[in-house]
Every structure is written in C-alpha cells, then in structure tokens.
C-alpha cells in the first residue's frame, strides 16, 4: 500500500489521507507514516477548486524543504484535530506553498470570500471552502486565471459500487 507507493517514488506520504477520504467521504485525519486512520467525520461545506494549466508531479516535490515546515504542518494538524478545518487548511496550504516555492496568490485571493483556502496536496491546484455565496465569489475570481475552476459540495458518503451498495 502506502509504503510501496513511497518506495516507488510516486508519492511523498503514501496517500493514505487521499485514499481514505475518497473511500469514506467526509474529513479524515490520518497518520500517513503509520498508515493509520485517526478520525473520520462528516463535514458539510461548499468547495471551489482551481486547477491551473500547469502540471506538477508529487514525486518531484522537494522533500527536504517540506521537512523544514513540519512544525507548522503539525500545528495545522492540531487545528484539524480540534475541528478548525478552515484554519488548518489555510495554515497547511501556506506552509507548503512556501516550502515548494509556489505562488500562494490564488489562496490569498480566495480568502477575501472563503473560510479557508490553500494548496491542494503538493499542487499545483488550490481549494477553498465556505458557504455557497462565498464559493461563487471565489470561483468568479479564479475564473480570471488560466486553468479550470470547479465548484463542488463535500461528499460525506464515500465511494459506492455501481449497484449502490457500500
């Protein structure tokens, strides 16, 4: 699973957080180093996602620079553990923008309307969360940028098979 993906160089973390969020829905907190799910809970919000035209592979991420922001990322994790998902997302996003030398402008611009915004994973995409009206405003601003903008609702149900069973 995660260890094999890390060894193959296709992921930095093992992607347990991504896999469990996709499978279970809602917000998940994981310890990727231990391949452990810590908590999963429902989270109802609207989401805007900005996908720039540029592409970036997570395997090309500067791991050493990412380690330098580990204390900030730990603080963001503590915020998430306390249920403060918007601030956790924003703090984590800015930390990784700095570590990965990515322009944080899309997140900064989104914060004019959204509750939280940040880099998605190692980028280059950004996500913002908030109520329907604020996410419409974020999407309007992001549509001025080169790339694609999606507006979505969080999925609290997780994956289901074609037959509808879970």
Specify the residue positions occupied by each region the protein language model found.
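Short, acidic Gly/Pro/Ser/Thr-rich loop/turn segments
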Residues: 36-37, 54-59, 135
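Gly/Ser-rich oxyanion-binding loop with an adjacent helix/lid
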Residues: 1-34
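A generic structural signal for well-ordered coil/turn residues at beta-strand boundaries
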Residues: 15-16, 23-24, 43-46, 122-123
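Glycine-rich, charge-dense phosphate/pyrophosphate-binding loop(s)
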Residues: 81-166
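C-terminal domain-closing interface element
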Residues: 25-53
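Acyltransferase
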Residues: 44-102, 108-112
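Short beta-strand segments
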Residues: 22-23, 49-53, 120, 153
């Amino acid at each position: 699973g995660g260890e094999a993906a890390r060894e193959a160089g296709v992921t930095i973390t093992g992607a347990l957080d991504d896999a469990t969020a996709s499978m279970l829905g809602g917000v998940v907190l994981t310890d990727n180093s231990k391949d452990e799910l810590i908590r999963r809970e429902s989270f109802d919000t609207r989401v805007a996602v900005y996908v720039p035209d540029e592409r970036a592979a997570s395997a090309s991420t500067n791991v050493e620079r990412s380690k330098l922001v580990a204390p900030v990322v730990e603080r963001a994790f503590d915020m998430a553990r306390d249920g403060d998902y918007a601030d956790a997302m924003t703090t984590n996003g800015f930390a990784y923008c700095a570590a990965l030398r990515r322009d944080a402008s899309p997140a900064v611009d989104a914060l004019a309307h959204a509750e939280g915004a940040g880099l998605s994973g190692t980028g280059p995409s950004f996500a913002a969360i908030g109520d329907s009206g604020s996410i419409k405003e974020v999407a309007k601003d992001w549509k001025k940028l080169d790339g694609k903008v999606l507006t979505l609702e969080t999925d609290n149900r997780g994956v289901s098979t074609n037959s509808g069973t879970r």
